[in-house]
Amino acid sequence: MFIINGEHWRVVLCSVHHPMLIRSDGSLSVGACDDASKTIYLNGNLRGDFLKKVLCHELTHAAMFSYNVELTIEQEELLAELIATYGEEIIDITNVLFYKLKERLA
């Protein structure tokens, strides 16, 4: 369990054919974020870097729900994918630059 903006969320590893991983068109998803139950569902077969990317993508959805960020579905998916793909690099660069600036300003 984890908390975002005071809301308790959980992560569930589930079967490939779990109802929450089946899209409305019948295709399968590797992850889903359900605001109503405050649950992130992940395909239990995911491993390694892809698991991390899908988890980050779904956590971004959870954060948007928890902070009442209202975007179109297309914008929401774009933001989640941006953070899942490049977020770690952005944070790493931010940390390096911040510490350099902090030392110069001290």
Predicted regions and their residues:
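Metalloprotease/metallohydrolase-associated module, dominated by Zn2+-dependent proteases
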Residues: 1-50, 66-106
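Active-site recognition of the HExxH zinc-binding catalytic motif
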Residues: 53-65
